[in-house]
Amino acid sequence: MRHTTIAALCLAFTAAANAAPSPGQTFFTQNCASCHTVDPKLSALAGPGLFNVVGRKAAAVPNFNYTDALTKAGAAGKTWTREELDVFLRDPNKDVPGTAMPIGVSDPKQRAAVIAYLATQAGQASAPVAAAASAKPTDQAGAWTQDKPGDLHHIKPTELIQPYASDSAGNGPKLAARPEGAMPAVPPGFTVGIYADKLGKSRLPLRAPNGDIFLSEAAKGQITVLRSKDGAKADTVSVYATGLSRPYGMALWPADKPQYLYVANVNSVVRYPYSVGDLKAKGEPETVIGKISDTSGGHVTRTIAFSKDGKTMFLSVGSATNVAAGIGARPPQPLAQWEAKYGVGAAWGEETERAAVLAFDADGKNRRAYANGLRNCVGMIVHPTTGELFCSVNERDELGDNLPPDYITRVKQGRFYGWPWYYIGANEDPRLKGIRPDLKNKTIVPDTLIQSHSAPPGMVVYQAPRGAQHAFPKEYEGDIFLALHGSWNRGIRTGYKVVRVFMKNGVPTGQYQDFMTGMVLSDRDVWGRPAAVEVAADGALLVVDDGGGVVWRIAPARSN
């Protein structure tokens, strides 16, 4: 009888271990796990650990750099009851204005499910370790303290360090107010000023033929237009469209005489009829792509670019997870059959058609794979001269302070760029060892490597419009400006700047140079986070800073 009871208990435990995950766990894995853990150590990623979060006081995890807004809410007694979590998750910035939580959960059933799951993640917590104290980088290379305009960088693929050479830090920035009189540092011969401010968390500027600047605001679900009479400062700020679902990438089509503004939502693409000079959308949008992928969590930015001839629409889709640890060793179909449908190196499971660039006709039809293995191609452009597609990629986390590098690269049709099994060529991720040896020699080495964990979300090829009064010197023509949003997975902060990527005949040389720096106050505090760049109609460079809610304008000290 005793043996029967023990056997029954063992079977029960086995069944529980193999049970399908709850809806809340599935939602958490697909939407939250890229930024939060639920382990008893309260390990931090971009966000704080959520073990024991239900019933916990707000901003209570030691050593995590909470925003002032959330810290004050916790000091005032805010506690994460189920009810408080429901209110917060519905609209984080409405509940706690100034929080860094970028998006909410609009579906009440999904909120209830994920809160129920978080309530099960409770027990005896381990003491969290201070990231900055325990996770020092192997050297000072790439540290914010070394940054200044003009500094050169060249990271070589043949000189990468080994995985886990340093601890993996959860060291997100604490956003501070810009000190009075503080301005970004730019090279001699340039000036910097404020083009627009009080914008919230805007991203990805797009210049219209008349010089208007479109901005996407994912958290608000809206598109905003900036207009300037003299080019120095925006004097008109107009909400173009609202009611969108985490809008990010935008494109005007066709480029020479635009008829539509395309907008990439988190899981669809829509377009608005457009005439040059429109400050408000003309009616409701037309859906061009009804569903981008089966999963939409994890990396939620979607970027659009059109081929030079306007016939192909490229759409970048970031990964659902950090490194696809849960998808298993084989796709649901024979590998050859899977890759015939989704392309060489295509992942599966929750990562199906993720970490990829997809291609469509301009009307959203004729869907096809273009390239795979690009973990999060946030910045995506078509080179205005060569017509080649470029991506700036946020690479994976938790391999150490200086591995792997982020990068910018030309993207070729049918090619594989490494994620999740490899990085920067034939370097195998030790967490996925031995799963895809067939891809080792098929993995493309990117063109220019960027300091690890810099987070490069937006870029532009510098080409001054004809007759531009504030055109940069000729030596800048054809180079790429790249925004580095800044690190969280590094013991000593890096990024938070704009760099110049050197080009030769439309091809990156491998070198880049600091161009705009000075937004980091300490290893804890920053007052700005460059998110994207655009060339204004007068030739000035506009830098969208979604940390400070500012668009900066950089121009030569002397106009042409």
Labelled PLM ranges:
Residues 20-42, 50-51, 114, 196:
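Sequence/structural segment immediately N-terminal to covalent heme-attachment motifs in c-type
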Residues 25, 37-82, 102, 239:
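Gly/Gly-Pro-rich "capping" loops immediately C-terminal to redox-active cysteine motifs
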Residues 79-130, 541, 546-547, 556:
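C-terminal capping alpha-helices of c-type cytochrome domains
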Residues 134-188, 258, 319-368, 375-518, ...:
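Beta-propeller domain segments
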Residues 194-199, 239-245, 288-296, 369-373, ...:
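Surface loop/turn motifs at the tips and blade-to-blade linkers of beta-strand repeat domains
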Residues 205, 250, 304, 377-380, ...:
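Hydrophobic core register within WD40 beta-propeller blades
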Residues 212-216, 259-262, 312-316, 388-392, ...:
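Conserved beta-propeller blade signature
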Residues 237, 246-247, 251-253, 267-309, ...:
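Asp-box/WD-like beta-propeller blade repeats and closely related beta-sheet repeat scaffolds
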